[in-house]
Every structure is written in C-alpha cells, then in structure tokens.
Amino acid sequence: LTSLILLVAVQAITEEDLELLRQTSAECKTESGVSEDVIKRARKGDLEDDPKLKMQLLCIFKALEIVAESGEIEADTFKEKLTRVTNDDEESEKIVEKCTVTEDTPEDTAFEVTKCVLKDKPNFFGDLFV
C-alpha cells in the first residue's frame, strides 16, 4: 500500500514522486516482512487483518508524514497528499473527514484509514500502495 502522495491540488504526481513511492514501499516491505501474496491481495482492495501488512501501511504512512510519531493521522498532510492524487480538493476533504480515525495502535489506525479510503475508491492506490 505504498502510498498516498504529496503536495497541493495544482501539482500533479511526477515520475520522481512515483519512484520515491516505489522505493518507500520496497523499504517498508523489507522492514515489515509482509508477504508478496498479502500485498497482491491488498492492491486489489482485499486487506487482510495481518500484523505485517499493518506494519507496512504504518511505515509508508510515516514516511509520507501522514501519521505522526504519536500514531495520530496528520489530517492536513493527509489531505494535501490525497489532493495530489485526486486533483480535487473537495473530494480529498470528504475522504479525510470520513477516514481520519484513531485506533488503539498506530498500526491499526493506518489499517483502518486505508480500508476506509478503499471502500469508496477501490483502485485508489493501485500498484503503488503496497
């Protein structure tokens, strides 16, 4: 689940952004130890309640500064990065309002945010997210 993206609505995702996201995802995969099968299913929107997948998501969210060290979602950063993908400030705002949650652990928070985003936008993250 490699990731949401950076910056404001007027700026689109660049090849450099995509490469950074791929690199971050690969580094997080090494750190989390999540299996390729779990990642493949996650790319299709089938998120397993897997501790390693949750670690993967949290790692990516931290790298993108979507999650603070405290484990809370940084709503402004989350919206900024979403807007790079959606190119729609209003849509991003709705997603952030709906999907910004705080669970018992930072891993669970990242997992639940991801599930929420994918409910409305099943292909939102595509091959990047994990």
UniProtKB/Swiss-Prot annotation:
GO biological process: sensory perception of smell
Any one GO MF annotation of this record: odorant binding
Domain of life: Eukaryota
Stored InterPro entries: PBP/GOBP, PBP_GOBP_sf
Pfam family, one: PBP_GOBP
Localisation: Secreted
Disulphide bridges, residue numbers: C28-C59, C99-C116
Function: May be a carrier protein for lipids.
Protein name as catalogued: B1 protein
Species of provenance: Tenebrio molitor (Yellow mealworm beetle)
